[in-house]
Swiss-Prot record:
One of its GO terms (molecular function) is quinone binding. The gene is ndhT. It is found in: Plastid, Chloroplast thylakoid membrane. Part of the chloroplast NDH complex, composed of a mixture of chloroplast and nucleus encoded subunits. Component of the electron donor-binding subcomplex, at least composed of NDHS, NDHT and NDHU. Residues 1-45 form a transit peptide. The chain crosses the membrane at residues 224-244. It catalyses: a plastoquinone + NADH + (n+1) H(+)(in) = a plastoquinol + NAD(+) + n H(+)(out); a plastoquinone + NADPH + (n+1) H(+)(in) = a plastoquinol + NADP(+) + n H(+)(out). This is NAD(P)H-quinone oxidoreductase subunit T, chloroplastic. The keyword Acyltransferase does not apply. Residues 106-172 form the J domain. InterPro entries: DnaJ_domain, DnaJ_domain_CS, J_dom_sf, NdhT-like. Its EC number is 7.1.1.-.
Length: 249
């Protein structure tokens, strides 16, 4: 009996520690899982977003434009060529030609040629007018002929050179366009507003004379003298009646 009791006690002593060790092992496993999950989360957070994958070495990812000079800064463009193209487009514009034709008192009108005249027409007009305005062959007064001949040489120097003629045409078109814009603005404005803008106050007579008396004309002086004589005659008549006339009469 004693042997059986001691055996049960020894067995219970062996089983209880195993049960306690098993519960402790379960708790340790849960704690280890929590720690592992935290570490994995920290690793993922520290790595950040994933970078895009690089393209293959043989793949061209650039943007291709239809023109090699389009879409790129510092393309292969010639500044002189661009300026020449702009001038050509400007001179070939119909509106530009109309502006030059609408001008008045221009070099073309002085020569008597059209705005699109070529160099031969300009030379022919210059030779014709030089004979007319030259001081030795002119029928005009010498001063007038000299002024016109000097202007003729200036006009020919401007229109005979291609560059100076382009610049002159450009300035002439700008002048005509500005004048047309001013006319359009005047048409759109209110007439009453135009009258108000052009109104100038007329100062009083005293303000215009600066405080001085106005000078009288000869006719005004004659009329004033006649008025004074009439007043004096009336005064003399009254005095005569009062002094020399008999009161009984």
């Amino acid at each position: 009996m004693a042997y059986a009791t001691s055996t049960y006690a020894r067995t219970s002593c062996i089983i209880l520690p195993k049960i306690q060790n098993g519960a402790h092992f379960t708790d340790d496993t849960k704690a280890f899982r929590r720690i592992t999950a935290r570490r994995v989360t920290r690793i993922y957070a520290s790595q950040g977003p994933t970078k895009p994958s690089k393209p293959s070495p043989g793949v061209d990812t650039r943007i291709h434009w239809e023109s090699p000079d389009e879409g790129w800064i510092g393309g292969r463009s010639d500044p002189a060529k661009s300026v020449d193209e702009d001038k050509t487009n400007l001179l070939s514009d119909e509106k530009f030609a109309e502006l030059i034709k609408d001008s008045f008192d221009s070099h073309y009108q002085f020569l008597g040629v059209s705005t699109d005249a070529d160099l031969e027409e300009i030379k022919s007009a210059y030779r014709r007018l030089s004979k007319e305005y030259h001081p030795d062959t002119t029928s005009l007064p010498l001063k007038t002929a000299s002024e016109k001949f000097m202007k003729l040489r200036e006009v020919y120097n401007v229109l005979s050179d291609e560059e100076t003629r382009r610049f002159y045409d450009w300035t002439l078109a700008q002048e005509v366009a500005s004048r047309q814009a001013e006319k359009m603005r005047m048409k759109l404005e209110d007439p009453k507003e135009q009258d108000f803008r052009g109104y100038e106050s007329i100062p009083d007579m005293v303000d215009r004379l600066g405080g001085r008396n106005m000078e009288l004309s000869d006719q005004a002086m004659t009329a004033l003298t006649f008025d004074i004589l009439i007043v004096l005659f009336a005064v003399c008549c009254i005095a005569f009646v009062i002094v020399f006339k008999d009161p009984s009469y």
